[in-house]
A protein has these predicted regions:
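N-terminal glycine/serine-rich phosphate-binding loop of ATP-dependent small-molecule kinases
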Residues: 1-65, 77, 81, 120, ...
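Alpha-helix termination/capping residues and helix-transition junctions
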Residues: 36-39, 48, 171, 219, ...
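Active-site core segments that coordinate phosphate-bearing ligands/cofactors
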Residues: 76, 80-140, 145, 150-161, ...
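Short, conserved phosphate/pyrophosphate- and ester-handling motifs at nucleotide-, phospho-/glycolipid
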Residues: 16, 72, 209
Length: 461
């Protein structure tokens, strides 16, 4: 089951870091028990985590408040104000992004709105940094983490202290930086009691969920693209170009094989309202499983007999210029349409969101040679995957792997030793390929209708 997200105000989204740790401990114990391995066979730990969240701890490492997570919209105005004050050119050349609604802006929001909490901060962290800290007792972060928080200066190849100074944030709050692939600390006796892991196991790898997902799918070179359709949807394209016309709708982050000499960047387009839309339908229409919903959707023709769903009900959408338009159910005829129509319209609406986003990437000169996805989310749906493949006229390769498997495999890699993980994936994990359908016309018509509805709503927001 997905973890709950608290929303104390409209547009806010929070989770308790202690809950992450509690569930990490439960899951680790369960993996050890169900896999029937001896704990002393475990040689290292890899961490994949939800990106952009802000974790604040005191000197004892205790969280000072719930984490303000990736889909929280409270810092949109903070980021927009900083973008205006700093200027487009500096943000473009040094950050490759606008400050946006990311971790640095969220930290500034805390400084302005929760000064008593801000005064107690010893370090800020990303979610994966917090899990690594709980495992090792050491507080550090990575270039990945700082770049996803819009705190990395690509020109000087160091922490963007000038941005933190602009926000009035003390430089001492930034953790030390370690490499993605490095010895980042070892488990201790307390961790052994909580997780069942022996003391002395090193944490060797750490990356945010999207660069890690790309690594898991052997998406490491320019032209290779990883897609995922979980709670949020993501298109993650690797490039070596340190430039972008899009500083807000698309975001550029350090990839796992980035170096100052080999500037591999992940251009990320995020759709907050993705799998969460399908989950909402499942929970509120009483379906027993996603498989049942997929079967119901298959009973309905392309275009859902006119029903249109815009799935943007999970906070401000960056690809919509940080507008929070909410989810929309349109053209529903109470005498004609059924829950099956809503299932199909939801799958199509999410698929159309991907197509809309990929169009933005292509307009930004993003090269797309191959697209790969794991077999553990919406890309398991033939309706969803075929709709995307048909409208972008591109094959989508599906592999039986997950981010957790990729993070585990990454433990055995050394920096630069990426060929081995790619070879293993291609030889062992391939499932199938979704190819563009020959009869594109009904898909183009349905997408055109969806896009028209979206544009009308955007004009009024």
């Amino acid at each position: 089951n997905e973890m709950d997200i608290a929303s104390p105000q409209a547009g806010w989204a929070e989770q308790d870091p202690e809950d992450w740790w509690k569930y990490a401990c439960l899951a680790t114990r369960r993996v050890i028990q169900e896999s029937a391995i001896f704990p002393d066979q475990i040689k290292g730990i890899g961490i994949s985590y939800q990106m952009h969240g802000l974790v604040l701890v005191d000197k004892g490492g205790n969280p000072l408040r719930k984490s303000i997570i990736w889909c929280d919209s409270r810092a949109v105005e903070t980021g927009e104000k900083a973008f205006e004050e700093i200027g487009v050119e500096r943000c473009k050349k040094q950050l490759l992004n606008s400050p946006g609604n990311f971790t640095a802006s969220k930290l500034k929001w805390v400084k302005d709105n929760e000064p008593d909490i801000y005064k107690q901060i010893y370090k800020f962290m990303l979610p994966g940094d917090y899990i690594a800290f709980k495992l090792t007792g050491e507080i550090n972060t990575t270039r990945n983490g700082l770049s996803e928080g819009i705190m990395w200066d690509y020109k000087s190849n160091e922490v963007a202290d000038w941005l933190l100074e602009h926000f009035g944030i003390d430089r001492s709050l930034t953790p030390d930086v370690v490499e993605n692939f490095s010895r980042q600390g070892i488990t201790n006796d307390q961790v052994s009691k909580e997780t069942g892991l022996p003391a002395g196991i090193p944490v060797i790898y750490r990356a945010g969920d999207q660069p890690n997902n790309a690594l898991s799918l052997n998406v490491l070179k320019p032209g290779e693209v990883a897609v995922s359709g979980g709670t949020s949807g993501v298109v993650y394209a690797v490039t070596d170009l340190l430039k972008s016309k899009e500083l807000s709708r698309i975001n550029s982050f350090v990839h796992v094989n980035y170096s100052h000499q080999q500037t591999h960047i992940g251009k990320l387009l995020c759709i907050n309202g993705c799998g969460i839309m399908y989950r909402w339908l499942r929970n509120h229409l009483g379906f027993g499983s996603y498989e049942e919903m997929n079967g119901k959707a298959a009973e309905i023709p392309v275009g859902s007999d006119g029903v249109v769903i815009l799935p943007f009900g999970n906070g401000a959408e960056r690809m919509l210029n940080n507008k929070d338009i909410g989810a929309h159910f349109l053209n529903v005829n109470l005498n004609q349409h059924t829950g099956s129509h809503l299932c199909r319209a939801a799958l199509e609406g999410i698929a159309f969101s991907f197509v809309y986003g990929i169009e933005i990437l292509k307009e930004d000169n993003t090269q797309i040679d191959v697209i790969r996805a794991g077999n553990d989310n919406l890309f398991r749906s033939e309706i969803f995957s075929s709709t995307v493949a048909t409208l972008i006229d591109q094959n989508i390769e599906i592999y039986s792997t997950t981010g957790s498997i990729g993070a585990a495999r990454a433990v055995s890699l050394k920096q630069g030793d990426f060929e081995r993980i790619g070879t293993f994936l291609m030889q062992n994990d391939y499932v199938n390929t979704y190819v563009p359908l020959e009869d594109k016309e009904p898909y183009l018509k349905a997408y055109g209708r969806w896009k028209e509805e979206l544009q009308m709503i955007l004009k009024n927001k």
